[in-house]
Every structure is written in C-alpha cells, then in structure tokens.
C-alpha cells in the first residue's frame, strides 16, 4: 500500500487517466474528487460491501432454486 500526504488543492495521478484531487480538508473529513474514465467503477467501500453481500445472497438463493428445480425434475421423471 502506498501512503501519501496531500494538502487541499493537490492531487495524485494513477496511470495517465485517473486523478484524485483533495478539494477540502475539515476537522474530521476530507472531500476528494476522482476523475476517471466512465468504464472505471468507483464506489465507496461501504456501498461496495453491501453490493458484495447482496451478490452472495443472490448466489445462495440461485443455488437453492437450482436444487428445488432438480428435485422437481427428478420427481416428475419418475
């Protein structure tokens, strides 16, 4: 992990197409701006974690549904 210090109105470049700018620094928060191509997904970590959990739930539900369909198919095949 790279750790950098930046002041307000300074920025960080990642590759040639991503720029992270420090807009404002307050007592307990930092306001940042991120410029990146539209195909780069940028999410707050708490939103990412929620999406990840919902995807896990969906996969488990799909597995349950597949199992139910298989059981029904087995029953109907008799």
Swiss-Prot record:
It is found in: Cytoplasm. Transmembrane segments: none annotated. One of its GO terms (biological process) is regulation of carbohydrate metabolic process. One of its GO terms (molecular function) is mRNA 5'-UTR binding. Keywords: Bacterial flagellum biogenesis, Cytoplasm, Repressor, RNA-binding, Translation regulation. One of its GO terms (cellular component) is cytosol. It holds the Pfam family CsrA. Its main location: cytoplasm. Homodimer; the beta-strands of each monomer intercalate to form a hydrophobic core, while the alpha-helices form wings that extend away from the core. A translational regulator that binds mRNA to regulate translation initiation and/or mRNA stability. Usually binds in the 5'-UTR at or near the Shine-Dalgarno sequence preventing ribosome-binding, thus repressing translation. Its main target seems to be the major flagellin gene, while its function is anatagonized by FliW. Belongs to the CsrA/RsmA family. This is Translational regulator CsrA. It comes from Borrelia turicatae (strain 91E135).
């Amino acid at each position: 992990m790279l750790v950098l210090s930046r002041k307000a109105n300074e920025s960080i470049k990642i590759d040639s197409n991503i720029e992270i700018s420090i807009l404002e620094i307050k007592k307990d928060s930092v306001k940042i701006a991120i410029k990146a191509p539209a195909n780069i997904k940028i999410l707050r970590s708490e939103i990412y974690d929620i999406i990840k959990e919902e995807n896990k739930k969906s996969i488990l539900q799909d597995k349950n549904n597949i199992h139910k369909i298989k059981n029904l198919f087995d029953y109907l095949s008799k």
